């Protein structure tokens, strides 16, 4: 059976943490910042963690990623 390939689009969007979790960027950060408060923009800059319900599915796509 051939090796599982890493889903390249997902590999560019997620980073693994030391404890085995995954970091991701926030949505809504591309444009139209005039409609968002300063506080909202500040919080959107920080990375977020992938939720536990999505973790198993995403890790399967990133099977070869270290």
From Swiss-Prot:
Keyword Acyltransferase included in the entry's annotation: no
Protein family per UniProt: Belongs to the bacterial ribosomal protein bL35 family.
InterPro entries attached to this UniProt entry: Ribosomal_bL35, Ribosomal_bL35-like, Ribosomal_bL35_CS, Ribosomal_bL35_sf
Superkingdom of source: Bacteria
Sequence ranges of Basic residues compositional bias: 1-46
UniProt keyword Ribosomal protein present: yes
Pfam family membership, one: Ribosomal_L35p
GO biological process: translation
Keywords assigned: Ribonucleoprotein, Ribosomal protein
Organism: Lactobacillus delbrueckii subsp. bulgaricus (strain ATCC 11842 / DSM 20081 / BCRC 10696 / JCM 1002 / NBRC 13953 / NCIMB 11778 / NCTC 12712 / WDCM 00102 / Lb 14)
Spans annotated as Disordered: 1-50
One MF annotation (Gene Ontology) recorded for this entry: structural constituent of ribosome
Protein name: Large ribosomal subunit protein bL35
GO cellular-component term (any): cytosolic large ribosomal subunit
